[in-house]
C-alpha cells in the first residue's frame, strides 16, 4: 500500500477503505472491479467517486443476492409441492391398507407401533400436590 502521498490520516483511511471495499466486493462477485485512484488535488471528488463505486458495488451485490434468494425460493416451493404430493399418496396407501387389513392385523400393528404407551381405555387421574387424587 502506498500511503506516502496522502497528507492526513483521513485521506489514508479513505484510501484503505476504498481498497478494502473494492477487494471485498470483487471477491464476493468473482470479478474485477476497476480501482479509483486518489490524488491530493481532488480528494473531495475522489471520495464522492469512491462512494459512488461502493454504492454501485453494493447494489450489484444486492441484486445478485435477491436473484439467488428468488431461485432458492422456487427450488423450495417445488420441493414442498413434491412432498405434499408424496404425503397425499402415502395417506391414500395407508387408507387402502387399513381397509384391506383384518381387525386382528390392525390390532397387532397398533401394538407394534406404540408398546410403551398406556392403553387408551384406562384414563389417568392427575394427582394433587399432596399425593391424593383430585
UniProtKB/Swiss-Prot annotation:
Region ranges (AP1-binding): 1-60
Modification N-acetylmethionine, positions: 1
Region (Disordered) residue spans: 108-134
Tissue spec: Ubiquitously expressed, including in the fetal brain and liver. Expressed in brain, lung, spleen and skeletal muscle. Lower levels detected in heart and kidney. Not detected in the pancreas. In non-lymphoid tissues, in the absence of inflammation, the major source of constitutive expression is the macrophage lineage. Also expressed in cells from different hemopoietic cell lineages, including bone marrow cells, CD34+ stem cells, mature B- and T-cells, monocytes and granulocytes.
InterPro entries: TSC22/Bun (IPR000580), TSC22/BUN_CS (IPR047862)
Keywords: Acetylation, Cytoplasm, Nucleus, Phosphoprotein
GO cellular component, one term: nucleus
A GO biological-process term: regulation of transcription by RNA polymerase II
Induction text: Induced in T-lymphocytes by IL2 deprivation.
Top-level division of the source organism's lineage: Eukaryota
Region annotation (Leucine-zipper) ranges: 76-97
Residue(s) carrying Phosphoserine: 102
Entry function: Protects T-cells from IL2 deprivation-induced apoptosis through the inhibition of FOXO3A transcriptional activity that leads to the down-regulation of the pro-apoptotic factor BCL2L11. In macrophages, plays a role in the anti-inflammatory and immunosuppressive effects of glucocorticoids and IL10. In T-cells, inhibits anti-CD3-induced NFKB1 nuclear translocation and thereby NFKB1 DNA-binding activities. In vitro, suppresses AP-1 transcription factor complex DNA-binding activities.
Quaternary data: Can form homodimers, however it is likely to function as a monomer. Interacts with NFKB1. Interacts (via N-terminus) with JUN and FOS; these interactions inhibit the binding of active AP1 to its target DNA.
Family note: Belongs to the TSC-22/Dip/Bun family.
Domain comment as written in the entry: The leucine-zipper is involved in homodimerization.
Name of this protein: TSC22 domain family protein 3
Organism listed in the record: Homo sapiens (Human)
Source organism phylogeny: Eukaryota, Metazoa, Chordata, Craniata, Vertebrata
Amino acid at each position: 500500500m502506498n500511503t506516502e502521498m496522502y497528507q492526513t490520516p483521513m485521506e489514508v483511511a479513505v484510501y484503505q477503505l476504498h481498497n478494502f471495499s473494492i477487494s471485498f466486493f470483487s471477491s464476493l462477485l468473482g470479478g474485477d472491479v476497476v480501482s479509483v485512484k486518489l490524488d491530493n488535488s481532488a480528494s473531495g471528488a475522489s471520495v464522492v467517486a469512491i462512494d459512488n463505486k461502493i454504492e454501485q458495488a453494493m447494489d450489484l451485490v444486492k441484486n445478485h443476492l435477491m436473484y439467488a434468494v428468488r431461485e432458492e425460493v422456487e427450488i423450495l416451493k417445488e420441493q414442498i409441492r413434491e412432498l405434499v404430493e408424496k404425503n397425499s399418496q402415502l395417506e391414500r396407501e395407508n387408507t387402502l391398507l387399513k381397509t384391506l387389513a383384518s381387525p386382528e392385523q390392525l390390532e397387532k400393528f397398533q401394538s407394534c407401533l406404540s408398546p410403551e404407551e398406556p392403553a387408551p381405555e384406562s384414563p389417568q387421574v392427575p394427582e394433587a400436590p399432596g399425593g391424593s387424587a383430585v
